[in-house]
Regions:
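Bacterial N-terminal signal peptides that target proteins for export
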Residues: 1-8
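Active-site-adjacent core segments of small-molecule enzymes
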Residues: 23-506
Length: 506
């Protein structure tokens, strides 16, 4: 009995057969190609001629197939689907995906690792990128986060240095624990994230088996201009599943792209992965009410203090048809905001607002927004023009009017979309200093104490596995001191495993 799938395959083959005789090979300019197997030569065995335009075009196109890979998050995959709202959040925001129960919004998602290159293994102990693009009626909205809810540093000025430490050494071209622990030993704010990363959470089993977080706080603004701060959390409906180092090594020996393959196969089998989206709120007047600064991305918003509110569910139901066009070319950026969402004062976020757009211009060109996967659903109306591969000019109502304001074309901004006015928690003075409430160890200790005995054992073993490769005893002792300040038991267990005496840290 012929299954439905086999029927579709047979129809496709038949279609290709019937249409194949009418499909003529052409050059990029549409001229028919007479021979795609042999170059033009001087005689049968002679040298190849430069006049073989088809050969030159083909080789030149091949030479330019690769674009610069992402400086971080190079290894990744993607999928498409939709978000369905389960709550009416119009009391808090104008953002269109969250206005009405049952509203569906198309989404694109890119999952990734952080530190390594495009062809690296997906079994690395590394944060996983979790970026979602909402194609709304008022433009594209991106939530660009990670699978862990915090980060290593709180100020973007340290980001290039941090990434340099987890990238391969410029001398050996190999990732080296000496480098990243050297950096972390002098960055106490990293203690919390290092602790989370070296638990079992540091190696997700697959992208569909991990949660996600916006990491940063943002602002929601309603129609009255009222502001509330929030964070987003994605909760996987497949259940959180992770790999031990032994399991990861066994998988890596056979398949460096296991997570990409697993996600693709699940979608092909119609086992569509889903995530519930939650928000947590803090009122602007409450920002200074805690023993930490809520807009510090090294800090977690406790679910006990800031309850999770479910607002919808994301379902991924389509794989990319062409990986380059739909995944490699997708441009996620935390600056892709829509009315009702604004950036917070988070120092790390403020740097990302520039850096992500800038790296997309470097990778994809100045008109990366015009690539199909990056195009919004609504019409783009502005007078940004020209440059490489621009198609904007042809969309001008009057080709001669490429400026605004003009008496000839009444295209104007809508004042209702102005950013909200609000009073900053800071006085209007220019400073260059750390934040007031660093509290680098409190949440790291709370997280450690929340772990089970088995999870603590795994954490210590994973940390010691890397720290034992660090040549500097001074760096090892500084890291132990950070762990000790987070929790005495935590620090002492690492110290003992590395051969230090307890008296060294009293």
């Amino acid at each position: 009995m012929i299954t439905q799938k086999k029927t579709l395959v047979l129809l496709l083959v038949l279609s290709l057969y019937l249409n194949g005789f009418s499909q003529k090979l052409t050059t990029n300019f549409g001229a028919p190609v007479g021979d795609n197997q042999n170059s033009q030569t001087m005689g049968v065995n002679g040298p190849v001629l430069l006049q073989d335009i088809h050969l030159i075009e083909k080789l030149a196109a091949f030479d330019r197939e690769r674009i610069p890979e992402r400086v971080v998050h190079a290894r990744g995959t993607g999928a498409f689907g939709y978000f369905e709202a389960s709550a009416d959040m119009s009391e808090y925001t104008m953002a269109v995906p969250f206005q009405k129960i049952g509203k569906k919004t198309d989404v694109a998602v890119r999952f990734s690792t952080v530190a390594h290159g495009k062809g690296s293994a997906e079994t690395a102990r590394d944060p996983r990128g979790f970026a979602v693009k909402f194609y709304t009626e008022e433009g594209n909205y991106d939530i660009v986060g990670n699978h862990l809810p915090i980060f290593f540093i709180r100020d973007a000025i340290k980001f290039p240095d941090f990434i340099h430490t987890v990238k391969p050494s410029p001398v050996t071209n190999k990732q080296d624990p000496n480098r990243y622990f050297d950096f972390w030993s002098l960055s106490p704010e990293a203690t919390h994230m290092v602790t989370r990363l070296f638990t079992d959470l540091g190696i997700p089993k697959g992208y569909q088996y991990m949660d996600g977080s916006s990491v940063h706080g943002f602002k929601w603004v309603n129609k009255e201009g009222k502001v509330v701060y929030l964070k987003y959390t994605w909760k996987t409906k497949q259940g959180v599943q992770n790999l031990t180092p032994a399991e990861a090594s066994a998988i890596q020996a056979k398949n460096v792209g296991h997570a990409t393959e697993s996600l693709r196969k699940d979608i092909e089998a119609k086992k569509f992965p889903q995530w519930d989206l939650y928000v947590q709120f803090i009122k602007p007047e409450d920002l200074n009410s805690f023993d930490f600064w809520p807009l510090d991305d090294t800090k977690h918003w406790s679910e006990k203090k800031f309850p999770l509110i479910k607002i919808g569910t994301m379902t991924l139901n389509r794989n990319p048809v062409n990986f380059f066009e739909e995944v490699e070319s997708i441009a996620m950026a935390p600056g892709n905001l829509i009315p009702g969402v604004e950036p917070s004062e988070d120092k790390m976020l403020q740097g990302r607002l520039f850096s992500y757009f800038d790296t997309q211009r470097h990778r994809l060109g100045g008109n990366f927004q015009q690539i199909k996967v990056n195009q919004p659903k609504n019409k783009v109306v502005n007078y940004n023009s020209d440059s490489w591969n621009s198609s904007r000019n042809s969309s001008f109502p009057n080709p001669d009017i490429n400026y605004e304001p003009s008496n000839h074309i009444p295209v104007a901004e809508e004042n209702k979309y102005r950013n909200a006015s609000y009073s900053s928690a800071e006085k209007a003075i220019i400073v260059q200093s750390p934040i007031n409430k660093t509290n680098n160890y409190g949440q790291a200790g709370e997280f450690y104490r929340s772990l089970t005995d088995t999870e603590k054992e795994h954490l210590i073993a994973n940390l010691v596995g890397d720290l034992s490769q660090v040549n500097s005893k001074d760096v090892q002792k500084k890291m132990i001191t950070h762990f000790y300040r987070a929790d005495k038991d935590y620090g002492m267990r690492v110290a003992k495993a590395l051969g230090f005496s307890a008296k060294d840290f009293r």
